[in-house]
Amino acid sequence: MANTVSAKKMTRKIAKRTAINRSRRSRMRTFVRKVEEAIASGDQGQALTALRAAEPEIMRAAQNGIVHKNNASRKVSRLAARVKAIAA
């Protein structure tokens, strides 16, 4: 338990930051899930639209420190490859 004023303030800040990060991570995962559902349905048009919406969200999460930028790039790349494979 925090005793000093500064420690109590840091506890509040951490709780606030954690809530924001949880929200951003959830938002990113929701967009990724929409792409994966579209891929599973086999509809390339819908999957491509979902991917175009998800890519900025994933990169924004990387910019905000939710995921590493290489992790974000890898997610986008793999999703794009899966969307492209639908046509083949």
From Swiss-Prot:
Signal peptide: none annotated. InterPro entries: Ribosomal_bS20, Ribosomal_bS20_sf. Keywords: Ribonucleoprotein, Ribosomal protein, RNA-binding, rRNA-binding. Belongs to the bacterial ribosomal protein bS20 family. Binds directly to 16S ribosomal RNA. NCBIfam families: S20. This is Small ribosomal subunit protein bS20. The lineage of its organism: Bacteria, Pseudomonadati, Pseudomonadota, Alphaproteobacteria, Hyphomicrobiales. The gene is rpsT.
